[in-house]
Amino acid sequence: MNPLFTIGHSTHVFPRFLALLQQHGIEIVTDVRSRPFSRLPWFSRPSLEKELKDNGIRYVFLGLELGARRDERECYIGERADYDRIAQLPLFQKGLERLNVGIAKARIALMCAEKDPLDCHRTILVCRYAKEFSDVFHIHADGKLESHEKAEARLLARYHEDAYDLFRSRIEQLNEAYKRRGEEIAYVEQPETSSAVRDAPWNDEF
């Protein structure tokens, strides 16, 4: 079984982004952005898909299944998306199942925009559950890998200076840290903003 990787495109130029993927032998980039577009045109879906294909890397869009900006109203508390609710969606569960199937066949990197894994739903939402069926590693901008366990340690330290709480287990503290970070980074709908542009689910499999 291959590990699962994640990467944030950040403000990289495409050659640097490609070099990071090649450094870690990535065969498939799985885009988990709800809106697969960027102010950096080489990271918008049409250009990105073509450039990756030209360099022997496949592009798969799973923003509908695993994205953090949802159309389903039941995923919101007020105007804020709730990660716990998103995780219960059948469509989200389907996305996780596709990842599980995919990593048996290829080296996959989940891609979103944010540089730091802890600033992105790819870590705080998707990998919180993907870690149950795969080892997870986050590709940083300098090319170094961070295990998901180390990312969780950073997350825990952000909210719990004393990791040796006598009254709560590490799991309880970690679950609270996930929830708090999710609330901080979750998508908040704006009244004047229309629904996110969506792609139909892809019928192809990994």
Predicted regions and their residues:
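Residues lining hydrophobic/aromatic ligand-binding pockets adjacent to catalytic sites
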Residues: 1-206
